[in-house]
Every structure is written in structure tokens, then in C-alpha cells.
Amino acid sequence: MQRFIKWLAVITSLDLLIVLLGGALVTKTGSGQGCGKSWPLCNGEFVPSNLSMETIIELSHRLTSGSAGILVTLLCILSWKYYKHVRETKTLAILSFVFLVAQALMGAAAVVWGQMPAVLAIHFGISLISFASVILLTCLIFEIDQKFDARSLIMDKKMKFHIYGVTIYCYLVVYTGALVRHERASLACPDFPLCSKNRPMPTQLHEWVQMGHRLAAMLIFVWILYAMILAIRHYKQQPVVYWGWIISFILVTLQAIVGILVVFTNASLAMALLHSLFISCLFAVLCYLVMLGTRSKVNAKEAASTSKQTK
């Protein structure tokens, strides 16, 4: 059974990633109304008779979201039953399921009542939490923490501050990026790093949205760089923290490069999807570090208790 659960966890994680990228594809191609204002049917039909490209993209996104719902539900039930001895399992199972349901409801609401940019940005943010929760659940199922000796990990307050702070801030940056996409402001500023050669400062709403996202992205790049330097200096003996921050920096660097290429490739579809891919992976890695941070206090108490008993 455990072998089956591991395969299920991997497939579910990949399915949710496809859902995230599919949502970005729907937005990029303007396929949000590919099935009209009909939900769960498509243009009022179970199998639409007229299949335009927009309809195929939107319908595919709905089907992958539906399959993700089934897989996440099954994974939550089985992990709850067979991995309940791991402290975070129940919490992650609940988060995975609740946020997936919320994601589906937000998606349905966007179809039926109109696609407001702010609502669509929230839709992506909710999807990201569900994806990260399933990734963490998968890590627990594969016992990644045991392989890196993470169960005895103890962090200082400074490192935990950076982990929690960067993760929360990353989530806010995600919303600014989603707002750029849904406000169709990706090309509002045709130059980089300034908005335009002729107008270095933004003058209209779409330009402010774009430049605000760039500023937020620059700050998270610097913050992760600083946290990585701390990890390299002080956590070489804790590989999960050491490599966690190095991987985070690699991902945020790739994210920044792709973000710049979005501007210079006229917002090509490939760059837009890679932009969504890298931020999803970065957020999942940061959430794993958060989970380790929550364990650190418990580990410190257990270490202190063991030390007293030894004396």
C-alpha cells in the first residue's frame, strides 16, 4: 500500500502543477470564456459541439482540475490513515483538500460572474497553497526529512525569521505577479530595468502595476540571497537548510531571468509558463523550510529535556 501511496503522491503533485500551469495558459491565451458562462458544463453541453482552441484549453483545464480533485481527496484519505504518526500529516491533508475546493469554487465563480483581475489573482494564490501542501505531503510520504536528518534540526531565531518572512513575502509577490498577468500589464513597460527609455517613471495604472511587481521581485531576490549567505556560513552541518536556501536562490534567479525575458520576448507563451513554473517550485521549497522551522522549537525542547536526563 505504501508503494501505491508514493506513486499517488507523485502523480497528484504533477497533476496539480499542470493545473497551475493550465491556469496560466488559460489567462495567457484569453481562454477564460472558452466555455462561455456555463459551469460545470461547457457552453451548456457535456461535450461541446464546437471546439475552438479557446474551448479546448479551458475544457482541458477543467478536466485536469477535476482529476486533481479526485487524486487529492484519495491522497488525503490514505495519508491520514497510513501516515497519521507524522505530526504534520493531518494539517497538510486538510490544507490540500480545503484549498483545492476553494480553488475550484473561485474558478467557477470567475466563469459565471465574470473574471475580475483581483479575483483571478486570488484564484492563483489559493492554487499555490494547495500545490505546496501536496508537495509537503509527498515529502513526508517519501521520508525526505529522515534522509536529511531533519527531525533533529534546530535553528536559531534569526534563521526562522528569514524563513517565515521570505515565505510570507513571496506569497505577496505572487499576488503582484498574478495581478500583472490578469491586468494584462506584462508589456506595460517595454524596457528594463526602468519602465521606458523615454519615461523612466510609470505614468498610468498598468505601468504602476508592472513596476510595483518588479520592485517586489527585486526585494525578494536580495532577501533570499542574504538568507542563502547565512545558511552557507552557519548551516553547513544542516544540509536541508543549506541546500534549501541554495535551491531557493537558484529558483529565484531563474524566475528573475525569465521575468526579464517575458518583457524582451513580447510576453511569449513559453516564458510566461516558465515564470509560473519557477515561482510555484520556489514557494514549495520555502514552505518546506517553514515546516522545518516549526519543528525546530519542538526539537530544541526535546534536546534540552534529554540533556537534563543525561545529567
From Swiss-Prot:
Highest taxon in the source lineage = Bacteria
- Disulfide bonds, paired cysteine numbers: C35-C42, C189-C195
Membrane topology listed for this record: Multi-pass membrane protein
Keyword Disulfide bond applies: yes
Active site (catalytic residues): E58
Q: What GO biological process term is on the record, naming one? A: heme A biosynthetic process
Q: Spell out which residues lie on the membrane's Cytoplasmic side.
A: 1-6, 84-91, 143-159, 233-243, 293-311
InterPro entries assigned to the protein according to its UniProt record, in alphabetical order: COX15/CtaA_fam, COX15/CtaA_HemeA_synthase, HemeA_Synthase_type1
> What's the Enzyme Commission number for this chain?
1.17.99.9
- Enumerate the UniProt keywords alphabetically: Cell membrane, Disulfide bond, Heme biosynthesis, Iron, Membrane, Metal-binding, Oxidoreductase, Transmembrane, Transmembrane helix
Pfam families for this protein: COX15-CtaA (PF02628)
Location(s), subcellular: Cell membrane
Extracellular compartment residues: 28-62, 113-121, 181-211, 265-271
Q: Where are the transmembrane segments?
A: 7-27, 63-83, 92-112, 122-142, 160-180, 212-232, 244-264, 272-292
Reactions performed catalytically: Fe(II)-heme o + 2 A + H2O = Fe(II)-heme a + 2 AH2
Give one GO term, molecular function aspect: metal ion binding
Q: Name one GO cellular component term.
A: plasma membrane
Q: Please list the residues that bind heme o.
A: H61, H123
- Give the pathway: Porphyrin-containing compound metabolism; heme A biosynthesis; heme A from heme O: step 1/1
Cofactor (UniProt): heme b
State what this protein does.
Answer: Catalyzes the conversion of heme O to heme A by two successive hydroxylations of the methyl group at C8. The first hydroxylation forms heme I, the second hydroxylation results in an unstable dihydroxymethyl group, which spontaneously dehydrates, resulting in the formyl group of heme A.
The record's domain comment reads: The N-half (TM1-TM4) and C-half (TM5-TM8) domains are connected by an intracellular loop. Each domain is formed from four-helix bundles and they align in a pseudo twofold symmetry manner. The N-half domain is the substrate-heme O binding domain and the C-half domain is the cofactor heme B binding domain.
HAMAP family, alphabetized: HemeA_synth_type1
**Name listed for the protein in its UniProt record:** Heme A synthase
In the UniProt record, the gene name given for this protein reads: ctaA
